[in-house]
Each structure stands twice: as C-alpha cells, then as structure tokens.
Amino acid sequence: MKPVRLKDLHIPKQVLQPMKTNSELDQFVSTRGGFLPSTVYIVVGGAGSGKTSWAIDTLSRIQDNNPTKKCLYISGEQDEIDNYELSTFIPGLLELDTLYLSGVKNPQKLIEETLDQGWDMVLMDSLEVVSGRIQTTTDLNSKQSLKWVMDLMFKHKRGNNPTNTYTGFLVIQQATKSGTFKGDSSIEFDTSGMLYIRRGHGTERHLEFSKNRRGESNVKLFYKLEDGQMVYMKEEEEVVEPTVKPTIGIPTIAFASLIKALAKKRFDTNLTQKESFTIVKELEATYKDLVK
C-alpha cells in the first residue's frame, strides 16, 4: 500500500451523516449526534450486565428513527424461541431483521451472503460466539476465525459490497472477571470505540467509553429499562429504601443470565435462555410465598 491523499479518494459525504436514536444517547456517542456509518464499536460487559438488551434497544431505535436505513441483528447464540422470550421485555426485537446462526452448518457462507445485501447498521452478538461458530465449521483455528470475522466487518465498513454501503457495527463482547475487554488488544486499536456497560443499583446501568474516535470518552451515561425501552439519565438516580417487603431485586434478564452462567460453571450444564427464564420465574414465585 502506498501513501494517499484524502482529496484523491472518493469517500461519500453520507459517511458523516449520523443515524439518530432521538435520545440522550446521540450526543454521547458522537459529536455529530448519533451513530455514524463506517464505524465499529465493541460493546463490553460482564454476564448479566444487559449488553444484549441495550444493543437490541439501540438498534431498534436506529431503525425506527431512520426508516430508509437497513438494520440487521446477527444472533450467534440465541435462537428464535430464546429471542421471542426476550421480546416480551424488549418489544423492539419483534421488528428487527435477524440472522440466526444456531444450528447453521455453514455460518461463514451465510454471514458473507447476508452482509453482501448491504446493511447500514449491524448488531453482532457476540464476537466470541460468532468466531467460535466459524472455527467449529471450518478448518480455521481460533485466531484465524477471529481474524476472518474482523476482516469481513472492516470490508463492509469501507463499503466494499455490491451496494457500496458503508456499514456500521455494534459488536458485543464478554468482559473478563476484572471487567476489562476479553480478546486481542489489536481489536481495541483497530475499532472506532470501546463501550463498557456497567451495573448500578437495581435496574440501572451506565455506559462509558474507554475510547471513542467520534466523540467523548470517560463520560458516564446512566440508563434503566422502563416499559420495554431504555430510559437515559445524565446522573444516577438516588436509591430510595423500600418501605414494603423486598422482592428478589434483580432484573429478570440479568438473573436468567446468572442462572445460565452458574449452571455451566458448577454443573457443566448448558441451559437454554428459555430454561433460565423458567427457573427465574419459579424462584420469584417461591420467594414471594416466603415473604408473605
């Protein structure tokens, strides 16, 4: 590759036109107010932090507020039944074009062909799971599979597809026990931003960029799930001590994720999302009977 001048490149002005969510999230993400095309954001959080719920809500908002844009959700782990359960908490999921990889024999070909259709914003859940499915269905090893996924994203980020669409990506990735990004450090260098989701009190969470090429970093934006959508707040709400008998106090989605992780760790059992939710509902019912 030889040196180039920006004026000699044919970069469309559309890459500077943000896709808005019409929420406080827009100014938090970029100085232009919204998610920009041709960006790759890694969304990092621990088990039960609400990464998937937040990302689905965000993609749904982008789709609703930008009707001419095409949005795609790549579900690497959860199948249609799992997501139907999740949609009872995040109704926007019902309207999203979703590519399911569970049980697919050739996910590599399916992902390639689907992305070639040209999408403005793609949510991938998750980088680890998708690259793992590539590894188990091809001759590529773990490192090569991860590189294949990253290379494919950057290909579409640069508009190298039949529709010349400069795709933006939200890519979920698990955090380590210490709360940091789990993966190759080169990913952090190459991407547009690293967005961390951290838990607060009850249903509250906050977002914080450790790196953001398109906006500010090390600034917190608080939010909570309320009536099927994320509600954003500039400051964390004051926690008021309850005057009535407490409930379990953990959001159902987060609790289900914890149950699933515990079953895997202690009993080496892989629960489906539906099984995890069923256990949570039974525990909640039992708890309510005990505190009557």
Go through each PLM region and give its residues.
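Phosphate-binding P-loop
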Residues: 30-38
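Conserved P-loop
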Residues: 37-109
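Short acidic, S/G/P-rich loop/turn micro-motifs used as interaction or catalytic elements
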Residues: 48-49, 79-80, 128-136, 176-179
